[in-house]
């Protein structure tokens, strides 16, 4: 079935992005997202809280770290506790006591993560609940209905997600279906004045399919666009080229959200390619394995070399963990049955991600982003000759030479 040829009915989508500065050499941009629960400075990293909370950190702590937007998961929240209960709590903001902005994903990613429990048809995604086995249909209309009830500031269209390593006819089918589903999401959206619906670009690693999707979806006047279908196991060389293709065709005056990206090098490179927003479970997940993010990569604090190391994770980090606890203390906690260490590492890792993007933004505002990138890479890898080839190539494509 071909893609729907006529754009959806959403008219005069709000302009939520204000560009403040642009790098004179690369595609890096600094901006502001003007959202119902406050302004968000971009580029921005958005921590992920699947079920109205982040593992290992409270909303109060997240607030104190300077986070002004985080994520919730429509699929999981739609199943438990359910949209009706959350609506009675004045939406997801009230339910989780979060005063700042929220972005909810559509549930589409669960087509990949819960592949054995799902089946995709034109109607929507048929899931078997991982909680009780009950059959449920997540259609574009139902996804938007749930997100309208949640009251999130940014909502995502339901898209047909396939793994980035999949090739063949399914990739084209999923791309065209995502365009059709976007129109259904636009038609079903009840609160366009209060909630900003983003489209999600699909097309896998096929440049022609992704170009077709970009041309079709940018005909729809939605408030923002996400780059989907990447960061799922493809090579980094393939990854950055699809990101660059996408940003080259997306409207300059609307936010560009690169989904599922959270490694520090990836963040810096993709800002250079023109992306504004990022999310990933990486900083919280890696904390649960005893890994602390630092400018040189990460510290595996379970290793015995840290048993008598009384320095903080990062002496220059202002987060509560680094201001209060030593590597030796965290090492000892990690080797006990106490889960407190995971909490301390989660606080630090999220702080690291937020500080990194804040530093990136400052460098763009001060027109020193290329120098920032070179210093970042030198610190991370020790020598530019040791930088990943894909990152060197990607940065060179936008005029930032590491050598």
Curated annotation (Swiss-Prot):
It comes from the Eukaryota. Expressed in brain, heart, kidney, liver, ling, skeletal muscle, spleen and testis. It is an enzyme of class 2 (transferase). InterPro entries: TGT, TGT-like_sf, tRNA_ribo_trans-like. SUPFAM superfamilies: tRNA-guanine transglycosylase (SSF51713). Gene3D superfamilies: Queuine tRNA-ribosyltransferase-like. The modification Phosphoserine is found at residue 139. GO terms for biological process: tRNA-guanine transglycosylation. Its EC number is 2.4.2.64. One of its GO terms (cellular component) is nucleus. Residues 260-266, 284-288 are annotated as: RNA binding. It is found in: Cytoplasm; Mitochondrion outer membrane; Nucleus. It is a peripheral membrane protein. Zn(2+) binds at residues 317, 319, 322, 348. Queuine binds at residues 105-109, 159, 202, 229. The active site is at 105 (proton acceptor), 279 (nucleophile). Disruption phenotype: Mice are viable and fertile but display cognitive defects, characterized by learning and memory deficits. Female mice are more severely affected than males. In the hippocampus, stalling of ribosomes on queuosine(34)-decoded codons is observed, as well as a global imbalance in translation elongation speed between codons that engage in weak and strong interactions with their cognate anticodons. It catalyses: guanosine(34) in tRNA + queuine = queuosine(34) in tRNA + guanine. PANTHER family: QUEUINE TRNA-RIBOSYLTRANSFERASE CATALYTIC SUBUNIT 1. Catalytic subunit of the queuine tRNA-ribosyltransferase (TGT) that catalyzes the base-exchange of a guanine (G) residue with queuine (Q) at position 34 (anticodon wobble position) in tRNAs with GU(N) anticodons (tRNA-Asp, -Asn, -His and -Tyr), resulting in the hypermodified nucleoside queuosine (7-(((4,5-cis-dihydroxy-2-cyclopenten-1-yl)amino)methyl)-7-deazaguanosine). Catalysis occurs through a double-displacement mechanism. The nucleophile active site attacks the C1' of nucleotide 34 to detach the guanine base from the RNA, forming a covalent enzyme-RNA intermediate. Heterodimer of a catalytic subunit QTRT1 and an accessory subunit QTRT2. This is Queuine tRNA-ribosyltransferase catalytic subunit 1.
């Amino acid at each position: 079935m071909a893609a729907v040829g006529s754009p959806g009915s959403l008219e005069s989508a709000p302009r939520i992005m204000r560009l403040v500065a642009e790098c004179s050499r690369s595609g890096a941009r600094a901006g502001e997202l003007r959202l119902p629960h406050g302004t968000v400075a971009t580029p921005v990293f958005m921590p992920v809280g699947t079920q109205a909370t982040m593992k290992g950190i409270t909303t109060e702590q997240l607030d104190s770290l300077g986070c002004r937007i985080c994520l919730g998961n429509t699929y999981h929240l739609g199943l438990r506790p359910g949209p009706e209960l959350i609506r009675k709590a004045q939406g997801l903001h009230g339910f989780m006591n979060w005063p700042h902005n929220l972005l909810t994903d559509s549930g589409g990613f669960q087509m990949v993560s819960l592949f054995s429990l799902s089946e995709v048809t034109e109607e929507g995604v048929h899931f078997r609940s991982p909680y009780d086995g009950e059959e449920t249909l997540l259609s574009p209309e139902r996804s938007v209905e749930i997100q309208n009830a949640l009251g999130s500031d940014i909502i995502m269209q339901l898209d047909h997600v396939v793994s980035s390593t999949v090739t063949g006819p399914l990739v084209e089918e999923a791309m065209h279906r995502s365009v059709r589903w976007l129109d259904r999401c636009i038609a079903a959206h009840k609160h366009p004045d209060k909630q900003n619906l983003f489209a999600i670009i699909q097309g896998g690693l096929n440049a022609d399919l992704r170009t077709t999707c970009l041309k079709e979806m940018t005909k729809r006047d939605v408030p923002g666009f996400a780059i989907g279908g990447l960061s799922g196991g493809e090579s980094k060389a393939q990854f950055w080229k699809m990101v660059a293709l996408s940003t080259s065709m997306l409207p300059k005056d609307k936010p560009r959200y690169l989904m599922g990206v959270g490694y520090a090098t990836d963040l810096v490179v993709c800002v250079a390619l023109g992306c504004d927003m990022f999310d990933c479970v990486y900083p919280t997940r890696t904390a649960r394995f005893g890994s602390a993010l630092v400018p040189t990569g990460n510290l595996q604090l379970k290793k015995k070399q840290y048993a008598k190391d009384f320095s903080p994770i990062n002496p220059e980090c202002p987060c509560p963990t680094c201001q209060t606890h030593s590597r030796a203390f965290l090492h000892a906690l990690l080797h006990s049955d106490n889960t407190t260490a995971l909490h301390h590492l989660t606080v630090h890792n999220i702080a690291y991600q937020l500080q990194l993007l804040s530093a990136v933004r400052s460098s763009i505002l001060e027109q020193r982003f290329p120098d920032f990138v070179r210093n970042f890479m030198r610190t991370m890898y020790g020598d530019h000759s040791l930088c990943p080839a894909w990152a060197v190539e990607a940065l060179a494509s936008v005029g930032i030479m590491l050598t």
